[in-house]
């Protein structure tokens, strides 16, 4: 009789413990996740605003950005860098990753567009009103064309306008578009070619001329989830969030042009 009573008490205890465990599982918050986003340097300001809004809605996800030139970021991904999502400033760099199987085409889209502009320091002593005046300069900065999309577009534009050969020896190459902007801001160069979004972010430069669309390849920013992401679910959530109305308004506020087209 005593043994039965003890067994009965043990069963009650086991039921109580299993019940508490089930409740704890139900009430346990989502596990903290750190999401790594590799993004073009020109997206820096806009993405910080989107990150803040996203993290408020998804408190268990911490977004960490790795900003740089799209070509350099592409190389990092092919070499196995732990990245969850890539937001590029160049379609060719992005499409190469899709072709090589690093990005799922079904989880990729062309998100925004941009424009290429010629900028000069606001306090410049040289009268530069457009691309035709670049022969007056001593130094002009563009991104390294092989790794910096803005540099690639800049070279295309200057070649199209038959200016490249005349100024090639004056070119100061930069690691990304933000470095070009810094050179112009500090008067280290007489002019630079950057995205319109970067020019609008600086009170120290002014736009001398905007490159016509037919002078260079279309400036499109695609984004996509990395196939071997350790956090594919959360990466897809951020990917979807990038394309919602609130995020598009933030991007457009910084000068980007909305596209929102699936690839």
Model region roles, listed by residue range:
Residues 1-26:
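Sec-dependent N-terminal signal peptides of Gram-positive bacterial secreted proteins and lipoproteins
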Residues 35, 61-63, 116:
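Conserved beta-strand core positions
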């Amino acid at each position: 009789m005593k043994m039965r009573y003890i067994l009965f008490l043990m069963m009650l205890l086991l039921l109580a413990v299993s019940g508490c465990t089930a409740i704890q599982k139900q009430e346990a918050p989502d596990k903290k996740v750190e999401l790594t986003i590799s993004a073009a340097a020109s997206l820096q300001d806009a993405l910080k605003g989107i990150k803040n809004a996203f993290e408020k809605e998804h408190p268990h996800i911490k977004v960490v950005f790795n900003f740089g030139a799209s070509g350099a970021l592409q190389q990092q991904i092919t070499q196995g860098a732990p990245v969850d999502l890539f937001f590029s400033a160049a379609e060719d760099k992005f499409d190469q990753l899709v072709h090589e199987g690093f990005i799922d085409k079904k989880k990729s889209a062309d998100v925004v567009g941009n424009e290429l502009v010629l900028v000069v320091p606001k306090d410049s002593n040289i009268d530069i009103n457009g691309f035709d005046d670049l022969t007056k300069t001593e130094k002009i900065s563009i991104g390294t064309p092989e790794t910096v999309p803005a540099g690639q577009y800049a070279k295309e534009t200057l070649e199209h306008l038959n200016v490249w050969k005349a100024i090639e020896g004056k070119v100061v190459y930069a690691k990304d578009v933000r470095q070009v902007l810094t050179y112009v801001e500090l008067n280290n160069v007489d002019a630079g070619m950057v995205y319109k979004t970067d020019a609008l972010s600086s009170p120290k430069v002014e736009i001398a001329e905007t490159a016509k669309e037919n002078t260079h390849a279309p400036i499109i920013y695609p984004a996509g989830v990395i196939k071997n992401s350790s956090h594919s679910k959360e990466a897809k959530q951020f990917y979807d969030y990038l394309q919602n109305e609130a995020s598009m308004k933030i991007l457009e506020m910084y000068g980007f042009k909305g596209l929102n087209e699936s690839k």
